């Protein structure tokens, strides 16, 4: 062992002698380093603690009521109640004059500087009463404004940036509609393609990889498309779908645009519930935020048709906020004991709400005019289990679907309530008639679906058993009770989708993937009955000419994609797309033509037919010509490639002959070929003979 160890040492010494001397990394004499600490350690110096004077957590509140010493304690309790929502208050100072009267402002110190910033953000311009609106500022802001130079310097002129045209999509001379198709390429990574529904084939406008984490949504007028990301949401628009604005709200799950696209509401989870933020779309600024217990009906905001008001339901109340200040209307909520649901008219500032039965008092449906808060119609209802409010798109009618019972059964503690002998009523409010008359339609069968005709005076319902239901169509006319005009029996459908232009309807079974296209003009003829197995969505285009059914990967993982049909149910296009997520038509803004001009165009529509037919023929001819030119170009490209390879093959002949033993194998005759037959055993079978 000793000998072996000594050998190892001698070997190590020999190896050490082979190594070169270690290099010297010391700076040469008189060397000057030109790198400063900011360049070398910038990221670390940015985290260096800075000196603080201790006033970062102090806010100054102006426009506080001036009160005498006898009322000071009451004032303190009111102010403390308002400002304590933003954090823990350490100290409050109310300066007073010689007589002890407050001077109208106060200094308030929070536990942390972030709480003071939150107080400025939330409570600045907070209205205490009719005569006092708080002006809240950080104490450090006064020092900042003191350091403003007295000599004014003109701002630097910024170069003009050409604004993106947000409405270019409606300037297409042929008025082709656009749509987007989303497909998931990886977890939390969705590709979105934007297309124009041109003839004979759609035209791809733009495709974005990793455009959103989950899904996309169009704004009501089609100006913007919103994408969802972990830090928040972003809206895009213009010819190339450039980013218009981003709204930081971590974990946003759902958004809602106001009807006129002035505001955006984002809903995101918090550890204790749901945070809701209302944003100004044009400026990107936060207008107001709310905290709710969870994602429920109580937390949802609903907008008036003109963006002037937004409302949400509270416990036994409705909170209506005015825009753009987002203060409560008349600085108070509307107290409505027992309210269970409400909805805005799509064309007027009228709210419909219903109240449940309480202590032998019947349920009630009320129409209230805003901002006057004047009740314009009431309807009492008895034996009510639930109500659903359905406005017609034109605002001409309101249908209240009433779930009624014959008998009520309660347990001993009255916690569990069972309704027996259920039947259903449809209360139809005629909004355009004097004193708003109400008609009633009673159905004794289970109601599976209800849908108004968007433009017209008909509504349809699915009633009966799920696998063998009936579809009934009713017509509503002035001064006459709603009449049953058609009943289609034994139809296996679960949903109803009216065309945006009325007249045509798709009766869909989204469980089995079957569809029936119906024309409701005269005889309610079923024009087509296609099927799309596992289809989970139906989308009409804004003009009512095309219908798309889709199989989303949210529902199944195989055979995802979408089919496109005409309004009569004729198949136009089948698209199989892996991990297809959603298909959305781009909405269109309302037409600028007057009612008289639209009627005149419809009346003289035959006059425009020849021009349209000629344009269609030219388009098809142009498409055929383009197809022939494309094929000719492909053939020329192939022949060019082929000739190039043949020339290369000829140039290599001498090399090829040399490698093949000086035998020209390119021109071998059949006689020079030796044919050899080889036989081998494939399988062996044994047959026993008797």
Swiss-Prot record:
One GO MF term attached to the UniProt entry: translation initiation factor binding
Coiled-coil segments: 614-645
Domain RRM: start-end pairs: 57-141
The entry's keywords: Coiled coil, Cytoplasm, Initiation factor, Protein biosynthesis, Repeat, RNA-binding, WD repeat
A GO cellular-component term linked to this record: eukaryotic 48S preinitiation complex
Keyword Lipoprotein: no
Composition-biased stretches (Acidic residues): 15-25
Keyword Membrane: no
Residue ranges of the region described as Disordered: 1-33
Family affiliation: Belongs to the eIF-3 subunit B family.
Function in brief: RNA-binding component of the eukaryotic translation initiation factor 3 (eIF-3) complex, which is involved in protein synthesis of a specialized repertoire of mRNAs and, together with other initiation factors, stimulates binding of mRNA and methionyl-tRNAi to the 40S ribosome. The eIF-3 complex specifically targets and initiates translation of a subset of mRNAs involved in cell proliferation.
Protein name per the record: Eukaryotic translation initiation factor 3 subunit B
